[in-house]
């Protein structure tokens, strides 16, 4: 009997209309904020909030190892078996199901697990970058979890992570890892010119300006994927420069489906344009490369020393 192994292009790039899982997306966003804040509270601070992020795994999202005194633990979202797992370096494991439950319930379950593992964790208990934030411990409003769409979201992150890493490998200058920022939320990778940037004006809802100014302390060209909402209703890839050089908004970029959003101040490539393309990988990479070139060329970056020479 033949065994069917997932991995076709259609399965790799699943449909992800935000309207079909908007409540789940909002709930999962807040769950990742809680877990991300755990990493933030325990980790030595790196520039640009790099010590706060999550990372894509073959099963979901992870914090990577987190110190707690001399102990080390790790938290993982498993979007295949739909569980949250907390592993310690001593071999102990705590787990509970990812299922329809309120943010407050998720919060209580996680801290119950910490207690049984002997971990004392404190975080700032309000969400960031969301309007009208509700304290995690009191949020009974957000309580949705559609396992199918959570899995689809992760599968999209898998593909974006894979291609973002390919793109990152072509740069010799300072670059971030490919990482999941739980504030927006988005998966992102950022290249740096090496020059200081003008002080960022800040003003992001429920995010201290000092955090924003640290994130944008130096010139960047950044790209990423986010599930949609607000000015862009459905999932999309994006690319922006800070500061945006003159002419950036009018630059010609690839593919034809990409466009510049004046409201967001960045280039947008709808996810469906990639998902339905004959060559999804090439379509996304063309967007990443052409928008970077627009930022770097118009911004006068030293590409001769920053770009990896092509063989």
Q: Which residue ranges define each predicted feature?
A:
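Glycine-rich, often proline-containing surface loops adjacent to acidic residues and nearby aromatics
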Residues: 82-95, 128-148, 235-238, 263-272
């Amino acid at each position: 009997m033949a065994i069917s192994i997932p991995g076709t292009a259609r399965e790799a790039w699943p449909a992800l209309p935000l309207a079909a899982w908007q409540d789940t997306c909002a709930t999962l966003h807040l769950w990742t904020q809680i877990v991300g804040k755990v990493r933030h509270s325990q980790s030595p601070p790196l520039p640009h909030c790099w010590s706060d992020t999550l990372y894509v795994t073959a099963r979901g999202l992870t914090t990577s190892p987190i110190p707690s005194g001399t102990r080390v633990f790790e938290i993982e979202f498993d979007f295949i078996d739909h569980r949250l797992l907390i592993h310690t370096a001593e071999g102990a494991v705590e787990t509970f199901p990812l299922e329809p439950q309120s943010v407050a319930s998720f919060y209580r379950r996680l801290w119950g697990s910490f207690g049984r593992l002997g971990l004392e964790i404190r975080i700032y208990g309000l969400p960031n970058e969301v309007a009208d934030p509700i304290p995690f411990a009191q949020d009974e409003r957000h309580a949705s979890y559609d396992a199918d769409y959570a899995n689809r979201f992760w599968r999209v992150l898998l593909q974006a992570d894979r291609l973002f890493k390919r793109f990152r490998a072509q740069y010799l200058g300072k670059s971030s890892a490919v990482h999941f920022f739980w504030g927006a939320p988005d998966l992102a990778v950022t290249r740096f010119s090496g020059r200081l940037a003008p002080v960022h004006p800040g003003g992001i809802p429920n995010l201290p300006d000092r955090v924003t100014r640290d994130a944008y302390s130096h010139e960047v060209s950044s790209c990423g994927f986010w599930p949609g909402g607000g000015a862009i209703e459905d999932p999309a890839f994006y690319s922006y420069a800070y500061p945006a050089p003159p002419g950036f908004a009018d630059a010609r970029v690839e593919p034809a489906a990409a466009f510049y959003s004046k409201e967001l101040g960045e280039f947008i490539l709808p996810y469906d344009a990639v998902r339905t393309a004959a060559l999804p990988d090439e379509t996304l990479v063309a967007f990443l490369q052409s928008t970077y070139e627009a930022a770097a060329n118009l911004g006068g970056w030293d590409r001769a020393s920053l770009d990896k020479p092509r063989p």
